[in-house]
Amino acid sequence: MADKAKPAKAANRTPPKSPGDPSKDRAAKRLSLESEGAGEGAAASPELSALEEAFRRFAVHGDARATGREMHGKNWSKLCKDCQVIDGRNVTVTDVDIVFSKIKGKSCRTITFEQFQEALEELAKKRFKDKSSEEAVREVHRLIEGKAPIISGVTKAISSPTVSRLTDTTKFTGSHKERFDPSGKGKGKAGRVDLVDESGYVSGYKHAGTYDQKVQGGK
């Protein structure tokens, strides 16, 4: 008798996973990684100190392309002047320029925030000679912390005889004078057009309309 056929193994009834869209999977994974990285970066990035905020304000002053991470010599001098690091006695403009040239790299034209702090340490020794090194640095930092560039150079009006002649209505003569009232306000059309005076009085007569008052006063 022939051997009975062995029963076939039961098929795996677990349905196979349907293949997903690879592009969607990659996008989801990328978003997950970016969100995790953003969270870690936000937690790792400390808040700027008041000194570094002042550094960045002066670093970008007058330069729309500046990032605030490096400072030019001109802005360094302005910071020292506006924040009164330069007192004209212990620290002068020359001292500030010398320190900047000493701290920056030979082929560089700017200084970083770390170099900025080194430069302040150099100036602190001169600015506060009667204090210890640490106290002097703290005093210099207090002069700068929270400060911003002082905006100056506002154009002022310059009075000159020529300008005054052209703008002061009280000095106008002839037909130009008739276009403005005593307050300097323009009369409009009345100041440009010769209107016929039909009052019966001679032009320029100053007592027009006073006859009736005189007659009534004499009675």
Swiss-Prot record:
UniProt entry tagged with the keyword Transcription: no
Result of altering residue 45 to E: In 4Glu; phosphomimetic mutant, does not affect G1/S-phase transition
Region named Mediates interaction with LIMK1: 1-116
Induction (UniProt): enriched in cerebrospinal fluid of multiple sclerosis patients (at protein level).
Record region (Disordered): 1-46, 171-192
Domain of life where this protein originates: Eukaryota
GO molecular function, one term: magnesium ion binding
GO biological process: astral microtubule organization; cell division; microtubule bundle formation; microtubule nucleation by microtubule organizing center; microtubule polymerization; myelin assembly; negative regulation of tubulin deacetylation; oligodendrocyte development
Ligand binding (Zn(2+)): 61, 72, 80, 83
Tissue-by-tissue expression: Widely expressed.
Enzyme class, broadest EC rank: hydrolase
Basic and acidic residues: bias regions: 22-33, 175-184
Mutagenesis or variant effect for residue 160 to E: In 4Glu; phosphomimetic mutant, does not affect G1/S-phase transition
The UniProt record lists the keyword Flavoprotein: no
GO cellular component, one term: microtubule
PANTHER family tied to this protein: P25 ALPHA-RELATED (PTHR12932), TUBULIN POLYMERIZATION-PROMOTING PROTEIN (PTHR12932:SF18)
Stated family: Belongs to the TPPP family.
Function: Regulator of microtubule dynamics that plays a key role in myelination by promoting elongation of the myelin sheath. Acts as a microtubule nucleation factor in oligodendrocytes: specifically localizes to the postsynaptic Golgi apparatus region, also named Golgi outpost, and promotes microtubule nucleation, an important step for elongation of the myelin sheath. Required for both uniform polarized growth of distal microtubules as well as directing the branching of proximal processes. Shows magnesium-dependent GTPase activity; the role of the GTPase activity is unclear.
Protein name in UniProt: Tubulin polymerization-promoting protein
Organism of this sequence: Homo sapiens
Name of the gene encoding the protein in the UniProt record: TPPP
